[in-house]
A protein has these predicted regions:
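Eukaryotic N-terminal low-complexity, Ser/Thr- and Lys/Arg-rich leader segments
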Residues: 1-6, 295-299
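Oxidoreductase cofactor-interface core, primarily capturing Rossmann-like NAD(P)-dependent enzymes
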Residues: 2-45, 56-59, 80-81, 93, ...
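Short, amphipathic alpha-helical "lid/cap" segments that border enzyme active or binding sites
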Residues: 62, 180-188, 283-294
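N-terminal Rossmann-like NAD(P) cofactor-binding module of classical short-chain dehydrogenase/reductase
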Residues: 65, 69-74, 99
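Beta-loop-alpha module in the N-terminal Rossmann-like domain of NAD(P)-dependent dehydrogenases
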Residues: 78-86
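ADP-ribose/adenylate-binding Rossmann-like module
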Residues: 89, 94-105
Length: 299
C-alpha cells in the first residue's frame, strides 16, 4: 500500500481525540484535517484545517473526504452509529484506511461481544469488514484495554476520591492498560505501517497491572491518607446494572459494571496475550509513570 499522508480525524475534541490530534500533527508525518458537524463550536489550534459536513449525508461526507488517505473515528458512545455513513463516504471518496472507534476491550473475545458498551462497536466492525470485501477500503482495529492515566485521573480503575476504593473480585486480576499518549503513538504507528496493519486488529499496552497494584502505588505515594478499601464482586455489580437496564436506565452508572467485567474478568481477556507496540515503534511506559500520575492526583 502506498504511504498514508492525508488524514482526517472525526471526534478530535475528546480526551483521546485531542491527544491523537496533537500527536499526529506533532509527528510532522501527515496533513491532518478535522471533520465536524456544521453546528460544532469546538475550537482548534490556529492553522488547523477544519471541514464541516452534514453527517447524515454520505455525499456531503464524501466531498469532505476527497483526497484523504485515512479516516480516524474517535467518537463517543452516542455517535458510534455515524460510522456507517463515514465508512460509505470513505469508500466513495477513495480513502485507503479506516480506523473505527474501538480503543478498548478485545472484541475478538466472544464474551465481550455481548456486553452492552460494545454492542454497537461489534455491529460497526461487521459493517466495515463486509464493506472492505467489495471495495479498496482497508481497516485497522486498535485494542488498548483500559486507559491508564485517564482511568486513574477519572477514578475509573480505582476510585480514590474518598480513600475507600472499591476492589472487585479480590483485586488481583491483572489487566492490560494503555496511556492516552501510547494510544496516540499507536495510531501514528498504524498509519506508518499500513501493510503490516491491514485488515487486522492491533494490540497496544503500557503496563499490565491489577487493582491491588494500583492501590499499593497510591498508598506509597500518599501513605498518610485514611485508606479503607471496600470489596465487592463483578457479579454483584453487573446484577445491579442489569436491574437498571431492565428499568430502561442507560447511563454511565449502568454501563460501568459491564466495562469492569471486560477489564477485571479473566474470561473476557483483559490480560492481553498479544502486543504490537514493538511492531509499531511505540515505547511502553512503566510503573514510575503510574506513580507520577498518582503523585499529581493525590498531592
Amino acid at each position: 500500500m502506498s504511504a498514508i499522508k492525508n488524514v482526517t480525524i472525526v471526534g478530535a475534541a475528546g480526551n483521546l481525540g485531542a491527544t491523537v490530534f496533537k500527536t499526529l500533527v506533532d509527528s510532522g508525518k501527515f496533513n491532518v484535517q478535522v471533520l465536524r458537524r456544521p453546528n460544532s463550536t469546538t475550537q482548534y489550534p490556529a492553522g488547523t484545517k477544519v471541514v464541516e459536513a452534514d453527517f447524515s449525508s454520505v455525499d456531503a461526507l464524501a466531498t469532505a473526504l476527497k483526497g484523504q488517505d485515512a479516516v480516524i473515528a474517535l467518537l463517543g458512545p452516542a455517535a458510534l452509529s455515524l460510522q456507517r455513513q463515514l465508512i460509505d463516504a470513505s469508500i466513495k471518496s477513495g480513502v485507503k484506511r479506516f480506523i473505527p472507534s474501538e480503543f478498548g476491550g478485545d472484541l475478538s473475545n466472544a464474551k465481550n461481544q455481548t456486553l452492552l458498551p460494545f454492542l454497537e462497536k461489534v455491529k460497526i466492525q461487521g459493517y466495515l469488514t463486509d464493506k472492505s470485501k467489495s471495495s479498496s477500503l482497508t481497516y485497522t482495529y486498535i485494542y488498548t484495554g483500559a486507559f491508564l492515566d485517564w482511568g486513574i485521573e477519572a477514578n475509573f480503575l480505582l476510585d480514590v476520591s474518598n480513600y475507600q476504593p472499591t476492589i472487585y473480585n479480590g483485586g488481583n486480576q491483572v489487566f492490560n492498560s494503555t496511556s492516552l499518549d501510547t494510544v496516540a503513538n499507536g495510531v501514528v504507528g498504524v498509519l506508518t505501517h499500513p501493510d503490516e496493519t491491514k485488515n487486522r486488529a492491533v494490540y497496544l499496552g503500557d503496563v499490565k497491572i491489577s487493582q491491588n497494584d494500583l492501590l499499593a502505588i497510591a498508598k506509597k505515594v500518599a501513605p498518610n491518607k485514611p485508606w479503607q478499601p471496600k470489596h465487592t464482586t463483578l457479579d454483584e455489580a453487573t446484577a445491579e446494572a442489569d436491574k437498571r437496564l431492565a428499568q430502561g436506565i442507560v447511563d454511565f452508572q449502568t454501563i460501568v459494571p459491564y466495562l469492569y467485567r471486560s477489564i477485571f474478568d479473566p474470561e473476557h481477556g483483559g490480560d492481553f496475550q498479544k502486543n504490537d507496540n514493538e511492531l509499531l515503534g511505540v515505547p511502553k511506559k512503566d510503573e514510575k509513570f503510574i506513580e507520577q500520575v498518582y503523585a499529581k492526583k493525590l498531592a
